[in-house]
Structures are given as structure tokens and as C-alpha cells.
Amino acid sequence: MSIKSNKTEILGSIRSILIACIVLFSSSQIASAQRTMKGQYHLAAEAAFAADPRVPAGAEISFGAYLLDSYVIGWINVTPDFVTLPTDHQLGYIPINVGADYMYRVAATRARSVNLYVGGGVFLGWELYDPFRKVPSYIDTGFGKGNLIYGMAPAVESEFFIARRLALTLGARMPVSISSKTEILKLHIKAGIRINI
């Protein structure tokens, strides 16, 4: 065998490998459009962070389904926070909410491997006041043990598919708690994973 024929064989092999990679990449991009197809169910687990960095992170779990150009979800979240009392003590509280959202896709890559959604929904929950009994007992907070809360929550969310059934999520929700004794508006930043099932 001559050096020229070896070089030709090597170049041919490299060309074949490159063509195979291009075919695999393009087919995976086309297939990723099916990741958000109508009727596809998904589960998500996300950490929820308050706008104030001193507040510990909460958590959210959701189950939903993609529609033609949107998705719907049902969720439950727990998001601790605190308010400062007139006595300068901090009253911790934990809202525990269940809710439902409708999210409309406003932007996406052609293959839908990156999507941006805007929407919102409604929620119902219970606000638990001073769950760890950090406020001295002689101080009357006027809050009681807890309070029923409800309202609506506009939201924005992006998803970045890193595998056929796995996406990273990043978003924000601003619950408007009509009956809350602590805060009417409260911004949460969410980040987590979503698994298509």
C-alpha cells in the first residue's frame, strides 16, 4: 500500500465520520421538536428563591402536559420568608400553596430545544406564621398561627433541553396574595429540572 492510498482511506473515513455526525446532530435537532409535542406529560422539581437573598430557598414540584403551543401544570410549593415586626423581631412564615398555570410559548428555537413561556394561574394555600417559634412568646404578633391565602400568579419560564427527555428550567413567578397578612406581592425566582414522561 502506498502512502497516498492510506491518506485517501483516512480522509474517506474522516469524511464518513463527519457525515455521520452531521446526520445524527440534525436528526436529534428534528427529534427535539417532538419533546414539547401535544399530549406529552412532564414532571418538574425546582428550587424557589425569594428576591431577598437572606431568605432560605423553597421548593416546587409540578406535573403538567404540553399543548400545541403551550403547556398546563398543577403545582405545589413551599417558600419560606420573613417580615420585620415593629419590635424589630423577624417573624418567619411559610406559605404552602397548590396552584395551576397556563403557560403560552412566546419564543423558541426552530427545534424547540430552548423555549420561553409567559402565562400564570391561580393558587390556594395556607400561610404558617412563626413555625420555628423564634419570636418570644411575650410579643403579640397579631398574626395568629396561620391564614388561608389565595390569589393569582403571573409567571415567565424558560426551558433548555439538554437531552431528549430532560430540560433545565429557569423562571419567575409573582404571586398576588389577596388575603395574605404579610405581603401582597412576592417575587420568586425558580430553577430546576423537568423530565418528560
Locate each region found by the language model.
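Cleavable N-terminal export/targeting peptides
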Residues: 1-39
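Short glycine/proline- and aromatic-enriched beta-strand/turn motifs that initiate or cap beta-hairpins
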Residues: 29-83, 190-196
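Short beta-turn/strand-loop junction motif enriched in small, turn-promoting residues
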Residues: 50, 105-107, 177
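Predominantly the C-terminal beta-signal and adjacent terminal strand-loop region
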Residues: 71-75, 152-197
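Short leucine-rich amphipathic alpha-helices used at interfaces
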Residues: 137-138, 144-145, 150, 194
